[in-house]
Design a protein with these regions (language model features):
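C-terminal edge beta-strand
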Residues: 111-122
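Short, surface-exposed linear segments at secondary-structure transitions and domain or protein termini
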Residues: 72-77, 122-124
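Beta-strand-rich extracellular modules
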Residues: 104-108
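Surface-exposed, short loops/turns at beta-strand junctions within beta-sandwich domains
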Residues: 90-97
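Short, conserved beta-strand segments of beta-strand-rich sandwich/propeller modules, principally
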Residues: 98-102
């Protein structure tokens, strides 16, 4: 499983299939330290390609799944509803360059949160 936060880019090669986990923040003890408000969790999510190199086809993205139990992402144990996962599949002739994925989640209080995830496709 690959782990990314919203502040970093992720490098992959052509023909790769990766399960990706995204930590949406910590919301413990009434302190807002991440993108989620204290006590809030993710209800649903969607992922799409928002930018890509000229002439490139979109990589294949699975549906977004909200974690229903504890999940470690980047060394932090995310409680249920604090992280999402999806599968990224790149084609054998995927165009090299930077892709920007747009993750959109809706929280249990009805708030919509959007995060851009940077994906660099290169030769490995």
């Amino acid at each position: 499983m690959s782990e990314i936060t919203c502040r970093q880019s992720y490098s992959v090669a052509r023909s790769e299939v990766r399960k990706v986990a995204v930590d949406l923040g910590e919301n413990t003890a009434g302190v807002e330290t991440g993108v989620l408000k204290a006590g809030d969790t993710v209800a649903s999510g969607a992922i799409a390609v928002s930018e890509k190199p000229t002439g490139a086809t979109d990589p294949t993205l699975s549906a977004v799944t909200v974690n229903s139990s504890g999940l470690y992402v980047g060394g932090r144990l995310c409680s249920a509803g604090e992280a999402v996962t999806f599968t990224l599949t790149l084609g054998a002739s995927q165009t090299y360059g930077r892709y920007v994925l747009l993750l959109t989640v809706v929280t249990t209080n009805g708030e919509t949160i959007k995060r851009r995830l940077l994906l660099d496709v290169g030769a490995e």
